[in-house]
Amino acid sequence: MIRIAVDAMGGDIGPDVTLAASLAFLQAHPDAELLLVGQPEVLAAHSLHAQLVAHARCEIVAASEVVTMDDSIEIALRRKKNSSMRVAINQVKEGRAQVAVSGGNTGALMAIARYVLKTLEGIDRPAIASQLPNARGKATTMLDLGANVDCTEEHLLQFAVMGSALVAAIAEIPSPTVGLLNIGEEAIKGGDMIKKAGRLLRAASDSGDINFYGNVEGNDIFKGTTDLVVCDGFVGNVALKSSEGLAHMIGDYIKAEFSRNLLTKMAALVAYPVLSAFKKRFDHRRYNGAALLGLRGLVFKSHGSADVFAFEQALSRAYDAARNNLLERVRERIAHAAPLLVAARAALPAEEALAAPFMSVESTVSTPAH
């Protein structure tokens, strides 16, 4: 039985989404249990409360506070110690749940998760990983998507190791290919850090720690050239939000053109099956649920504006991660890559080596997680 702790108060909409999605998820997953964490009086007022309370595989866990989307990391971490977000993560720490899911403030979630669960041995910084649709009809996993704006080559190696474990667990690809996001495929392209990262990833591939494809460009993300794309959080966040903007623009453009006049509306009816398939294939809601990798517990982030369908997808992704032992897979891959990680740390300048394990929570940036 897989038990998931759900921050029922998180997200832009809160219980109206999380409770409906939770009920649908329970109906689709007979071997799953949910701990719904939230303010009892708010949850009790919801129309689905009675069904969920009566459900044999659902339990309400009380939390007196809520982390809002506008709360600073300091407020979320130091003042709201009984928030639904923190209590949900505590369920993982205490062993009552295998994974936590929240649609709340991304920066606060990362800060609280890191404070409560701590990072895995051998990992300096947690990273945010999510999926983007590709031309192969599958998905490309990408990290980091915003947790770390400044990275060393060692961090990118850690991301590659953790991301490979994620893809192996979620997509069931034993040896996922890894691409390093760059401005060109050639090894001579990019800045010094990217070149060093390329050499480090190649060494990791030679030692069997990862399956390194080489450098990839931005268009390769959507071609599906590799199963996993690794980059720093600044680049990843820009790429993610650019793709979101482009997708919305294309959707709005198609809708406007088919609504132009009676003839185009008739054409839309004829083209409906194709348009419907197109929309489904590129529906970002299907890929909702980003993993916070590198922690001593599993945490997944849902998009704050997720609807019921999207939040259910995030629950399903968290369920798959727990069922396929993602945390143990990450630990095993880190242990296997430990000699290379230690060697990479030893090669860092003294000041970088000292600073590597520490990341101020203020450097965590908010990013949508699809």
Swiss-Prot record:
Oligomeric and partner information: Homodimer. Probably interacts with PlsY.
EC number(s) recorded for this UniProt protein: 2.3.1.274
Record GO biological process: fatty acid biosynthetic process; phospholipid biosynthetic process
Principal location listed in the UniProt entry: cytoplasm
Biological function: Catalyzes the reversible formation of acyl-phosphate (acyl-PO(4)) from acyl-[acyl-carrier-protein] (acyl-ACP). This enzyme utilizes acyl-ACP as fatty acyl donor, but not acyl-CoA.
GO cellular component terms listed in the entry, alphabetical order: cytoplasm
Keywords per UniProt: Cytoplasm, Lipid biosynthesis, Lipid metabolism, Phospholipid biosynthesis, Phospholipid metabolism, Transferase
Name of the protein in its database record: Phosphate acyltransferase
Cellular compartments annotated: Cytoplasm
Species per Swiss-Prot/TrEMBL record: Polaromonas naphthalenivorans (strain CJ2)
SUPFAM superfamilies linked: Isocitrate/Isopropylmalate dehydrogenase-like
GO molecular function: phosphate:acyl-[acyl carrier protein] acyltransferase activity
InterPro entries documented for this protein: FA_synthesis, Phospholipid_synth_PlsX-like
Involved pathway(s): Lipid metabolism; phospholipid metabolism
Reaction catalyzed: a fatty acyl-[ACP] + phosphate = an acyl phosphate + holo-[ACP]
Family designation: Belongs to the PlsX family.
